[in-house]
C-alpha cells in the first residue's frame, strides 16, 4: 500500500503562505524537506510549482496538479487531479504531498503520515493548512524546539493516522 505523507511548515495560526510565498525563511526546514523528499515522488498544485525557486526539484519525480488542461510544467508531469497523481505513484513506497492549501485539503483524508514543521510565528497570509483533527491523528514524534540560523523558532512533528 502506498504511504502518503503530507509535508508542510505552518505558523501558529496554520498559515502556510502569503502571496504565493512562504512568510518565513528557515534554512534548516528546507534541508529537512530536501533530505526527506529526495528519491520520492512529490505532488504539488500549480501555484506551489510556480513558487519554487528551482524547477523541477532535483532528484525527485515532480507531479503538478492543475485544472488547466493545457498547463505545461517543464520538467514535471502535469495531471488534472490528486487521484491521477497518486495513481502515477503506484509503484513507489511513498508519495509526498507538498502543497498548497487546496491540495492539502484534498489529501488529508487519504494521508497516512503528516510531517509538520511548527513555526513559532503568527503571520498574516492567504493560504492555510487544514486543522489537524486529533481524533484521526496521533503525534508519533516531536523534536525539541530549535531556533534557526535566521532566528525563527520551530519544531518538527510527525503524526500518524489512527
Curated annotation (Swiss-Prot):
Residues at which substrate binds: 7-9, 29, 60, 117
Coiled coil segments of this chain: none
UniProt entry keywords in alphabetical sequence: Antibiotic resistance, NADP, One-carbon metabolism, Oxidoreductase, Trimethoprim resistance
Pfam families linked to this entry: DHFR_1
SUPFAM superfamilies for this protein: Dihydrofolate reductase-like
Gene3D superfamilies cross-referenced by the UniProt entry: Dihydrofolate Reductase, subunit A
Chain positions recorded as NADP(+) binding sites: 8-9, 16-21, 45-48, 65-68, 98-103
Molecular function as annotated in GO: dihydrofolate reductase activity; NADP binding
Top-level enzyme category: oxidoreductase
One Gene Ontology term, aspect cellular component: cytosol
PROSITE patterns assigned: DHFR_1, DHFR_2
This protein's name: Dihydrofolate reductase
Gene transcribed to yield this protein: folA
Amino acid at each position: 500500500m502506498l504511504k502518503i505523507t503530507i509535508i508542510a511548515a505552518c505558523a501558529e495560526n496554520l498559515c502556510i503562505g502569503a502571496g504565493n510565498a512562504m512568510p518565513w525563511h528557515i534554512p534548516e526546514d528546507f534541508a529537512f524537506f530536501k533530505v526527506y523528499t529526495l528519491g520520492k515522488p512529490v505532488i504539488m498544485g500549480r501555484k506551489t510549482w510556480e513558487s519554487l525557486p528551482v524547477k523541477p526539484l532535483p532528484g525527485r519525480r515532480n507531479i503538478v496538479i492543475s485544472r488547466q488542461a493545457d498547463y505545461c510544467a517543464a520538467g514535471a508531469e502535469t495531471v488534472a487531479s490528486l487521484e491521477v497523481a497518486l495513481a502515477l505513484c503506484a509503484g513507489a513506497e511513498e508519495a509526498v504531498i507538498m502543497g498548497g492549501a487546496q491540495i492539502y485539503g484534498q489529501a488529508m483524508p487519504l494521508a497516512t503520515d503528516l510531517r509538520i514543521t511548527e513555526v513559532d510565528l503568527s503571520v498574516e497570509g492567504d493560504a492555510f493548512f487544514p486543522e489537524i483533527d486529533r481524533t484521526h491523528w496521533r503525534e508519533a514524534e516531536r523534536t525539541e524546539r530549535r531556533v534557526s540560523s535566521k532566528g525563527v523558532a520551530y519544531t518538527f512533528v510527525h503524526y500518524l493516522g489512527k
